[in-house]
Amino acid sequence: MPTLKEKIIQESQRLGIDKIGFTHAEPFIELEDSLHEQRERGYNSGFEHQNVEERIYPEKTFEHPKSIISIALAYPTKAQEKMPRDEKRGQFARASWGIDYHHILQDRLQKLIAFIEEQAATEAEKEHWRFRPQVDTGEYVDTAVAQRAGLGFIGKNGLLITEEFGSFVYLGEVTTNIQFEPDEPVPNGCGDCTRCITGCPTGALLGDGRMNAQKCLSYQTQTKGMMPEDYRKKMRNVIYGCDICQLVCPYNKGKDFHFHEEMEPKIEEVYPKLAPLLTISNKEFKQQFGHLAGSWRGKKPLQRNALIALANLGGREAIPQIILCLNDQRPVIRGTAAWSLGQLAKREPEQSLEALNYLLSVETEEEVIEEAQKAIHLLTSKKGSRSTE
């Protein structure tokens, strides 16, 4: 007769859960010092759950917890559609491909809970059992739960690395008052490898599985203000997220799984044309990108990033659309458009200089004025040296 745990494992496979593990619900004391240190040093992104105690102690958010069930879903790393070679395109990081993974994980977790409730021997037992599902918007540090539940180990890039799927997995968990036999944690397998640390273009990784999230390109692409100039070139054409620390990891070599249809990327969504993004309406944005995890911050960060990506790709054909962005109501878009023109218009700067000078004559926002002045300086200095380019 299989145990309840064995039944859950079997059902998880039927539900399309790629990996499952069980751990106790004791406090994550090992996280306490590092979580406080991250906050004190200003390394947090601000997207984390703000109550540190609730991140460490499961009993703070769940009465009498006994176990935590951790699940992982593997996501694809390569698009099956062929990439068109036409206009300049941006890119969403792989964790934003397909339907928003939060919805997919919640669906699997709720179905798993429903199955467990069906296994109750009596109505009294069923009423006594309690569950609390959550994904990365909840209190827990998902990677710490998954590591303790035996799904994988936390790499130097701060991500959970599984034997089967590398780090290309979404994580979720269920806290319950049912006692399960815990699985064995997975020991760290990075060894002396530092490829993610040396590969990170901003030096965000601290070397011990933690990061300065403020320096992470993924974080920078999700902010709503002006992106600091140091990060703009390093962003390349990735308008949401950053996969570098995953792509360089030896555990991820050759990993590409297509288990879940709802995770499959569509080229026009995850490799969008950049120029049309600059003038996309709210309705069009919601229709094209609203179901992606990468749309959660709205269109402004993505439009700002599209202006940066066009400059990085040498998208001079988009200069007319970029000039139109100088009239945008949002200072971030006006300022970033000015910077983009300064990078792109060096060969034929006259039209851009005219637009930038007009912007200066009417602009009141200091950060926009500063960007416009820098762009004008670049274009006027390059104007005299075009023959040498």
UniProtKB/Swiss-Prot annotation:
Presence of the UniProt keyword Oxidoreductase in the record: yes
Enzyme Commission designation: 1.17.99.6
UniProt cross-references to InterPro entries, sorted A to Z: 4Fe4S_Fe-S-bd, 4Fe4S_Fe_S_CS, ARM-like, ARM-type_fold, PBS_lyase_HEAT, QueG, QueG_DUF1730
Pfam families, sorted: Fer4_16, HEAT_2, QueG_DUF1730
A single GO molecular function term of this UniProt record: 4 iron, 4 sulfur cluster binding
Catalytic activity: epoxyqueuosine(34) in tRNA + AH2 = queuosine(34) in tRNA + A + H2O
Binding annotation for [4Fe-4S] cluster 1: 190, 193, 196, 249
Cofactor: binding comment: Binds 2 [4Fe-4S] clusters per monomer.
Cofactor(s) this protein cannot do without: cob(II)alamin; [4Fe-4S] cluster
Main location: cytoplasm
HEAT-like PBS-type repeat copies, ranges: 303-328
Residues of the 4Fe-4S ferredoxin-type domain: 181-210
One of the GO BP terms on file: queuosine biosynthetic process
Keywords: 4Fe-4S, Cytoplasm, Iron, Iron-sulfur, Metal-binding, Oxidoreductase, Queuosine biosynthesis, tRNA processing
Residues that bind [4Fe-4S] cluster 2: 200, 216, 242, 245
Function: Catalyzes the conversion of epoxyqueuosine (oQ) to queuosine (Q), which is a hypermodified base found in the wobble positions of tRNA(Asp), tRNA(Asn), tRNA(His) and tRNA(Tyr).
Subunit structure: Monomer.
Protein name according to UniProt: Epoxyqueuosine reductase
Protein encoded by which gene: queG
